[in-house]
């Protein structure tokens, strides 16, 4: 077995780790906003999936059921956007290393 190539593998792994850290830092600043109820509810997530903003139209304060439905819809859409973005970043990162 030729162990001389392990140094190259170690360097490749270090490069992947560094790129992943950079992408995660950049992703943290990415904002995904979803709206429901014609914009009556708006939620924003950062790229890490943390809820960073929530807006609810005052007219919904009287209608708890509608507010719950709109909140669930907006939150689910926002979560899906974050997950889709994560998948795209992972595929892009793997694609970059496949070129090496």
Curated annotation (Swiss-Prot):
Gene3D superfamilies: Nucleoid-associated protein YbaB-like domain. The keyword Heme does not apply. Keywords: Cytoplasm, DNA-binding. InterPro entries: YbaB-like_sf, YbaB/EbfC. Pfam families: YbaB_DNA_bd. GO terms for molecular function: DNA binding. One of its GO terms (cellular component) is bacterial nucleoid. It is found in: Cytoplasm, Nucleoid. Homodimer. NCBIfam families: DNA_YbaB_EbfC (TIGR00103). Belongs to the YbaB/EbfC family. This is Nucleoid-associated protein HPG27_32. It comes from Helicobacter pylori (strain G27).
């Amino acid at each position: 077995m030729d162990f001389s190539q392990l140094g190259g593998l170690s360097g490749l792994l270090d490069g992947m780790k560094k790129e992943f850290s950079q992408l995660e830092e950049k992703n943290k600043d990415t904002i995904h906003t979803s709206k429901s109820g014609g914009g009556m509810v708006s939620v924003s997530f950062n790229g890490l999936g943390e809820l960073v903003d929530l807006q609810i139209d005052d007219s919904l304060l009287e209608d708890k059921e509608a507010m719950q439905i709109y909140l669930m819809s907006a939150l689910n859409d926002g979560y899906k956007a974050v997950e889709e973005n994560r998948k795209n970043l992972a595929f892009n990162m793997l694609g970059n290393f496949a070129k090496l």
